[in-house]
């Protein structure tokens, strides 16, 4: 089954990649003759260390990416994963041990056309499969994700939309019967935020007395990253908070695959996905996995943690450092405001080492300058209680390079500075930030 999943996910990702590239190529073709090259851009980030952001949910999460012992724990624990989407039930103890919510990808336990056929070929057989799994794993606390990308005909769904709805209904009723009223069941885990599909799905569920406790979809278009937050807010308003759908008992909005193929190794783009998904108010997210640049097994199945680490020697790549810094700071998030949607930042009162932190970067979205100058305005540093009164604070900026699959064992420090805080505002200008790169400012 795993070999089949590897091949199917490769086919599915290639086909989905071709769609994304066609969209991006069309945009570039239209823009070639009318948009001049942009050499430099400017972005301002204002951080108020006195204004906390309570209730922030971490978007650190993964799709497959590991085996029983690899990658080693010391490369996973610092990332503090909150969601793990997989069909590998034998990994349940390890993944939940990291603090992650286990999301069972039910369709991967069944297969896509072979060897069992499709659920609509024999609904009774599908129900029996779901029932057997539910009984075998009744004691495990997990989210049940019924089917993967039913809007992508090849390879994940060959039936009609109505047949998918029926497939969900059959699985839902079995799970509710076997596991009771508290088990979290969800979907439809479609390839993008398609409001028409979601509306039709939820209307069907409402009309058939079904629940959708976890409403899920994927965000994989690297050219529309900043649309993610509006999508989540729209889903919250249109569905989760809409009295018309109260009977569905929607508890969660899970973007259970984020980050497309072009962005998979780019630090700033990874940060942008985390930023906009968090800002939208999603319950959780999981990093998607794609083909390595040189070919070989999909990053879902080569023990690379979805591409964050090098397989084999198990050493971190640049994007691993983005996830680490993101996870270091999410529990003490403070307000950050910016004036350029491509220049994004997430700030925290503490990174766990008694240092305030700002994680920021400059990512590509349409025609973009190759570099940016970023001005950081730091407010209310005195309220952090760092150091002794009257003593200087140490500011350190480290660069997370756009280095693809290369190993990055340590981050290069690009600036060190001591400041004495004499008022409530400190301004710091960071010039020549390269597109796709991210930076970490620590204050302590």
Name the predicted role of every residue range.
Residues 161-285, 291-292:
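Noncatalytic carbohydrate-binding groove/subsite architecture in carbohydrate-active enzymes
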Residues 261-356, 362, 369:
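Aromatic/acidic polysaccharide-binding cleft in carbohydrate-active enzymes
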Residues 40-89:
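Boundary/entry segment of secreted carbohydrate-active catalytic domains
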Residues 409-444:
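C-terminal beta-strand-rich structural cap/linker in extracellular carbohydrate-active enzymes
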Residues 19-32:
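Bacterial N-terminal signal peptides
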Residues 1-13:
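N-terminal secretory signal peptides that target proteins for export/translocation
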Residues 340-393, 398-402:
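Carbohydrate-binding surface patches
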Residues 62, 81-222:
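Substrate-binding cleft and catalytic face of glycoside hydrolase catalytic domains
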């Amino acid at each position: 089954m795993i070999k089949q999943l590897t091949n199917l996910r490769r086919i599915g990702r290639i086909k989905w990649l071709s769609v994304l590239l066609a969209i991006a190529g069309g945009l570039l073709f239209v823009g070639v003759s009318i948009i001049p090259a942009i050499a430099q851009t400017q972005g301002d980030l204002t951080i108020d260390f006195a204004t906390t952001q309570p209730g922030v949910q971490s978007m650190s999460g993964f799709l497959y990416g590991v085996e029983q012992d690899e990658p080693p724990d010391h490369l996973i624990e610092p990332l503090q994963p909150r969601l793990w989407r997989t069909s590998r039930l034998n990994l349940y103890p390890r993944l939940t041990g990291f603090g992650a919510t286990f999301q069972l990808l039910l369709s991967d336990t069944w297969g896509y056309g072979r060897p069992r056929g499709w659920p609509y070929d024999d609904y009774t057989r599908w129900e029996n499969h779901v029932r057997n799994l539910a009984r075998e794993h009744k004691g495990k606390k997990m989210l049940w994700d019924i089917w993967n990308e039913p809007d992508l005909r090849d390879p994940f769904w060959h039936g009609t939309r109505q047949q998918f709805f029926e497939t969900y209904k059959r699985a839902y009723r079995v799970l509710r019967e076997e596991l009771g009223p508290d088990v979290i069941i969800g979907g439809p885990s479609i390839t993008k935020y398609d409001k028409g599909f979601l509306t039709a799905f939820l209307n069907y569920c409402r009309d058939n007395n079904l629940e959708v406790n976890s409403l899920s979809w994927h965000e994989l278009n690297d050219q529309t990253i900043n649309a993610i937050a509006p999508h989540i807010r729209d889903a919250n308003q249109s569905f989760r908070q809409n009295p018309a759908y109260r009977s569905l008992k929607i508890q969660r909005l899970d973007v259970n695959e984020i980050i497309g193929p072009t962005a998979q190794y780019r630090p700033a783009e990874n940060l942008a996905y985390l930023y906009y998904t968090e800002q939208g108010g999603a319950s959780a997210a999981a990093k998607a996995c794609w083909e390595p640049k040189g070919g070989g097994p999909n990053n879902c199945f080569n023990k690379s943690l979805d591409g964050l680490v090098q397989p084999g020697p198990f050493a971190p790549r640049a994007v691993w450092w983005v996830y680490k810094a993101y996870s270091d700071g999410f529990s003490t998030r403070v307000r950050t405001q910016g004036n350029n949607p491509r220049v994004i930042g997430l700030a925290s009162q503490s990174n766990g080492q008694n240092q305030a932190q700002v994680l920021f970067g400059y990512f590509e979205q349409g025609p973009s300058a190759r570099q940016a100058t970023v001005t950081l305005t730091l407010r209310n540093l005195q309220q952090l209680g760092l150091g002794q009164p009257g003593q200087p604070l140490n500011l350190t900026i480290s660069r997370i390079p756009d280095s693809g699959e290369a190993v990055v064992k340590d981050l290069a420090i690009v600036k060190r500075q001591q400041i004495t805080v004499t008022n409530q505002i400190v301004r710091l200008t960071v010039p020549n930030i390269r597109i796709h790169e991210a930076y970490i400012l620590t204050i302590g």
